[in-house]
C-alpha cells in the first residue's frame, strides 16, 4: 500500500495524467455458516479526475488488503470503465497481485486452471484495447516456482518480480 500511495502522490504532480486506484477482494455478508453471503468486490479507492490527495491521506490508513483476489472476475466487471489507449493517449494498467486468483461461494467456484486462464484472457483483452499492462508479484511465497509460474501464465511478458516495497525497484521497470 505504501508503494501505491507514493506512486499516486508522484503521478498527481504530473499535468495531464490521470490515475485510478482500485482494490479487489471479497466481501462476506454471511452471518452464519456457508459461503452464500460472499461476493467479489472492487473498490475504487482513488480517482484523480474526481478526488484530491486529501482522500488518500485521510482514508487510506483504514484500508486493509485481505480476502481472496478474484482477479479476472474483477477485471471483466470494470473493463468498460478503463480508458483505452490511442495514438495520442497512453493507458496503463498497473497491477499488484499474489498470483493466486480465486473466489468461491455457493454459486461460484473460481480457482486453479479456470481462474488462471480467465485472468489471462482478461489481460489479453486489456492489451487488445491498447492498454499497457504492468503486473507485479507480491506475497510471502516470492520464491515459490509454482506461484511465479502461474503469475507468468496470466501476465506473460508484462509480469515483474520485484520488491514492491521499493518504489525505486518498481520505477526502474516502468
Model segments located where?
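Acidic, glycine-rich A-domain
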Residues: 1-174
